[in-house]
Swiss-Prot record:
Alphabetical list of PANTHER family matching this protein: DNA POLYMERASE CATALYTIC SUBUNIT, DNA POLYMERASE DELTA CATALYTIC SUBUNIT
Biological role stated in the UniProt entry: Replicates viral genomic DNA.
Domain of life assignment: Viruses
Keyword DNA-binding: yes
Protein name according to UniProt: DNA polymerase catalytic subunit
Organism of this sequence: Human herpesvirus 6B (strain Z29)
Transmembrane segments: none
GO annotation terms (biological process): DNA-templated DNA replication; viral DNA genome replication
Keywords: DNA replication, DNA-binding, DNA-directed DNA polymerase, Host nucleus, Nucleotidyltransferase, Transferase, Viral DNA replication
Amino acid sequence: MDSVSFFNPYLEANRLKKKSRSSYIRILPRGIMHDGAAGLIKDVCDSEPRMFYRDRQYLLSKEMTWPSLDRVRSKDYDHTRMKFHIYDAVETLMFTDSIENLPFQYRHFVIPSGTVIRMFGRSEDGEKICVNVFGQEQYFYCECVDGKSLKATINNLMLTGEVKMSCSFVIEPADKLSLYGYNANTVVNLFKVSFGNFYVSQRIGKILQNEGFVVYEIDVDVLTRFFVDNGFLSFGWYNVKKYIPQDMGKGSNLEVEINCHVSDLVSLENVNWPLYGCWSFDIECLGQNGNFPDAENLGDIVIQISVVSFDTEGDRDERHLFTLGTCEQIDGVHIYEFASEFELLLGFFIFLRIESPEFITGYNINNFDLKYLCIRMDKIYHYEIGCFSKLKNGKIGISVPHEQYKKGFLQAQTKVFTSGVLYLDMYPVYSSKITAQNYKLDTIAKICLQQEKEQLSYKEIPKKFISGPSGRAVVGKYCLQDSVLVVRLFKQINYHYEVAEVARLAHVTARCVVFEGQQKKIFPCILTEAKRRNMILPSMVSSHNRQGIGYKGATVLEPKTGYYAVPTVVFDFQSLYPSIMMAHNLCYSTLVLDERQIAGLSESDILTVKLGDETHRFVKPCVRESVLGSLLKDWLAKRREVKAEMQNCSDPMMKLLLDKKQLALKTTCNSVYGVTGAAHGLLPCVAIAASVTCLGREMLCSTVDYVNSKMQSEQFFCEELGLTASDFTGDLKVEVIYGDTDSIFMSVRNMANESLRRIAPMIAKHITDRLFKSPIKLEFEKILCPLILICKKRYIGRQDDSLLIFKGVDLVRKTSCDFVKGVVKDIVDLLFFDEEVQTAAVEFSHMTQTQLREQGVPVGIHKILRRLCKAREELFQNRADVRHLMLSSVLSKEVAAYKQPNLAHLSVIRRLAQRKEEIPNVGDRIMYVLIAPSTGNKQTHNYELAEDPNYVLEHKIPIHAEKYFDQIIKAVTNAISPIFPKTDIKKEKLLLYLLPMKVYLDETFSAIAEVM
């Protein structure tokens, strides 16, 4: 064990780590010994692990020199000053028994135990560096009658073993205001309790809370204290004024390691990055029984790992392949050959330690690749891999939050941790930022890179791999291409810059940005502003403020459904919820919880919000400006400054950084409201969340009332907005037809289009000035003409003569087949781009059942009916392309795990298994078509009809035309339902009734006809 040992109680169950063993289980495919041979060889090996590179043998050890890498010795530094950039930091503990090589001036901070902040980054010269920071105290506040009794209680907790660790602590009186609830007086009998050990601080705080003490800020972790209390950046540049190198007994695996006191650090505002090293990696496995590999199954081994090493900027592209068995050379690739899986995995982790990338990416590596490697080393080989991180006693691990276990393979969000490494998995990034039918790497590469993967079926991988060195090279190229594609995706989306900006803004680590929710990012911001105002945050017990939590959500006005062939103006409230919170001073710090605190104030100083039987009151800014309001104001002002700076910026990289910064500010602003409404959050407050939505409803209703009462005459538009009589084409009619949370749809009849477009922004400004407090602002967004308003949150509209806007309609659903989508799209296009159909649709929507029977449908509607007839012909005459009839569902878990077995995509998988064809993996989207039933039974279930599209094409199986046409009728009816007249007949039946009748004979009748 190193003379400097660090312990993180959140990551380690105990301080005794597993020891590396001299012997190990050796598992390898028989085919790498005898070409083409199936099965595995399993035995125990006593020889030293080794690898082969370019026909030379290398023994594997942590301190080995990696053959393909050139390591340059670090230079000597001036001990009086150093400049460095950090991308990550972790909290660790040091104990008395570990101080032998620690400089004397830092020893008292860790006797008997103490916190050490480890910061990872690059020096100004590009050297990888670890900075050990001493002197950061961890503390909380506690209400108690006197300090002596509190000290005795804490001493007793340490002595009785509830904490199982001791450290120095200090108790001192504190004079602070509570953030929660308006009050003019500081908290009575308040003490600040400071500890040298962050773990002890948190444990003591929780125990005191459970014993009934009122405590504050026990949930604030020591890294947040470090960044907030000192005004430090969690991602950025620092000067260290004075430091001492750690030459002996290092705690890190980096060549440069220094020690300093927290007061020696100075944070700098430079936003530029140094060059950071990155990896993109991918693994290939062999499932022993042909099933999807399970890391805990002994025989489901890793056979290859590809790594592409690159930098955050520049063109460096170094490719590495770790493989079992010998492998033919691949151009431009370093190939490392291993005799067993354990040696391959060990070689990979040694390479991780030696090359030591700061960022690691891949595609679904959190849920699969990294998780698989960790489980293999832990469960199969019982080998501790934390030493391969940036810390010698570090951690490489995974965790799945309890609530995520119930989710499927791709839906579960696994948290991964490696000391000093940031994981940026491109799968969750791209699946959250773009819309696609599925999120397989091949699909995303086609959409975003216009590149297609070279396919190698899962059946071919084992055959190729055991066939010999040339076959393993084929598998290696296939493995490498995934890593290469991910590098291109990584550089295209630049998510790492976005993460860094959020981290800087929120005073949290980049790891927190990636793996934690919004409240973890907002909480430190609130803490920062509260600290500036001498306020402290109460620690909520689990039941406090959560009983019966829930409130009426955002208002959606009942839409006046219909087909509108006249212009509809859409207005949006700019940053609605943040604006409401700022305008009305809504905050924890302004909420009135005790009426005695406002006894000396007049009612004009108080905002009262009534919600049914409940009333919430807040003091106005003249009494106290809210903490949340101040934060929001600052962020929005910064965003305006950043966007202005972007306009004048010519440097592409700086412009990218500025864009990520303004996006981080926008996201953070929009998250504040959610923090107050999170029932199980750090600072829930139903009074704030409910008041925001209540005031939002009032704004929506007041806008509707104003439009319906004040904006109904030509005189209004002439006097207020400068129109003249020539701007009107008939009797003016203005009405609000829909309101959805922060949007208002206003239909305007008989006003010239050019005039309406000119005054639309003026209308928004007029309503804003008349009705709302600053900074609430109604903005003109767009004009839709025509508009099909189907129901709440579902509409289709045409913008700017050519662009169709879809919201919540079947046309864009992932589960609809392309054929159905195409028919719906054609009919929607007729309604929006064919004037004859538009005129007919308006007439059709106002017809009665009697008029329909006597007059028939308007002429323009026949174009819609003809398109439906064409689709019917294609389906019933088997002329539709099977590839356009494919439906799909995601296989979210193993087939056996489904409680409902009668699902279409599961039926397809069973058919494939029966025919011994390739079985999809968990996470894949399963494509299928519905085939004609053999019995002619119309009531056959979909799962009985579902078949693999390739099998249908190969065997020319007829499809179930009636099922598909039924889907078309339903989808078309849903999309254009507002144009149907109001009759007693169901709309789907009416549409079928309007179509000309036609009988389609199947092959049986054709055969009879031939005989006759």
